[in-house]
């Protein structure tokens, strides 16, 4: 009956995907060997749809964001949308139909193109973990003065998940992502083919940042200076521990610096169940460069095939 087959689960977080396995139990408490797996993502508040034609609430993403209030959702249908977006401090969820279906094909088919004129996504107004960006491809961002060709985060901590951040450029730091004073949780994100003339081809974390990386792939990014893949720049005598779990750092290059894969400067990092492979640096530390009182713990991880020092400096 309905009472026995219904289950109220609370509290749930807006924009978070929950996974369930449903089975049957008979009157003798025997559990059926057959189960049904399902996933769901709760959506609170109003939902604003964005479509490339005129059939949605809006045809451009920023207009939809501007119309939202806290806890609302912007649901983006497949297509390519030109121009960067800015959350402007709002506690909202922005995502593709991946958000409602769990179908990863929507990540590839729903694209925000930065027009090589700005960061593709910007979080600089104190956004916290209730600001979520999910299920999208971000590409063709470009910044000259600030970092973060793909995503710029400053004094904010949005949640980033199930994204692809591709082919973006920065002149300062963080071709893919620049994270300044942020504590973001970054999950199942691909950061690839980005570049920077400064530090951190894929990602740059600095000024007290402490993001958590889970299931992140950082590949084929390039930097002129240090950290072709990822650059961590801690504050002097920093005790903040950077956490990387199930991360793949591969094929990244530092053309005139150190740390082709990962560069640590005055930083503490723990890397677990990860791969650091086939990266290269022109000076030293093809896979990893650890400088200025940095500490690194590697657990159940592989470091191999890196150029110059074949791994750790």
Identify what each model region corresponds to.
Residues 1-15, 27-35:
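Recognizes extended acidic, P/S/T-rich segments that occur
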Residues 20-21:
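Hydrophobic beta-strand segments within extracellular beta-sandwich modules
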Residues 46, 72, 83, 90-92, ...:
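The right-handed parallel beta-helix/beta-solenoid scaffold, focusing on the short coil/turn
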Residues 53-58, 62, 70-93, 97-99:
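N-terminal extracellular ligand-recognition/capping segment immediately after the signal peptide
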Residues 54, 91-146:
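Right-handed parallel beta-helix/beta-spiral solenoid domain characteristic of secreted/periplasmic
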Residues 73, 95-96, 109, 130-140, ...:
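Right-handed parallel beta-helix
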Residues 109-124, 144-152, 170-179, 196-206, ...:
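Extracellular beta-strand/beta-solenoid scaffold signature
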């Amino acid at each position: 009956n309905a009472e026995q087959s219904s289950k109220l689960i609370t509290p749930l977080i807006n924009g978070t995907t929950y996974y369930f396995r449903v089975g049957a139990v008979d009157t003798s408490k025997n559990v059926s060997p057959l189960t049904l797996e399902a996933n769901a993502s709760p959506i609170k508040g109003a939902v604003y749809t964005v479509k490339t034609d005129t059939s949605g609430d809006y045809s451009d993403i920023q207009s939809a964001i501007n119309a939202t209030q806290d806890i609302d959702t912007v649901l983006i249908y497949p297509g390519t949308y030109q121009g960067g977006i800015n959350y402007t401090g709002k506690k909202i969820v922005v995502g593709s139909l991946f958000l409602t279906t769990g179908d990863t094909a929507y990540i590839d088919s729903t694209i925000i193109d930065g027009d090589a004129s700005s960061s593709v996504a910007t979080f600089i107004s104190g956004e916290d973990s209730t600001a979520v960006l999910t299920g999208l491809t971000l590409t063709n961002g470009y910044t000259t003065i600030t970092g973060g060709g793909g995503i710029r985060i400053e004094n904010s901590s949005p949640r980033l998940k199930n994204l692809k951040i591709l082919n973006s450029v920065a002149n300062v730091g963080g071709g893919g992502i620049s994270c300044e004073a942020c504590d973001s949780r970054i999950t199942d994100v691909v950061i690839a083919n980005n570049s920077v003339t400064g530090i951190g081809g894929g990602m740059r974390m600095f000024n007290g940042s402490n993001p958590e990386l889970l299931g992140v792939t950082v590949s084929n990014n390039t930097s002129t200076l240090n950290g072709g893949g990822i650059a961590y720049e801690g504050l002097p005598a920093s005790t903040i521990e950077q956490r990387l779990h199930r991360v793949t750092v591969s094929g990244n290059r530092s053309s005139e610096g150190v740390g082709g894969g990962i560069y640590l400067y005055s930083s503490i990092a723990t890397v677990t169940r990860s791969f650091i492979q086939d990266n290269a640096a022109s000076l030293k530390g093809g896979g990893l460069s650890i400088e200025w009182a940095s500490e690194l713990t590697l657990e159940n991880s592989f470091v191999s095939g890196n150029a110059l020092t074949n791994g750790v400096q």
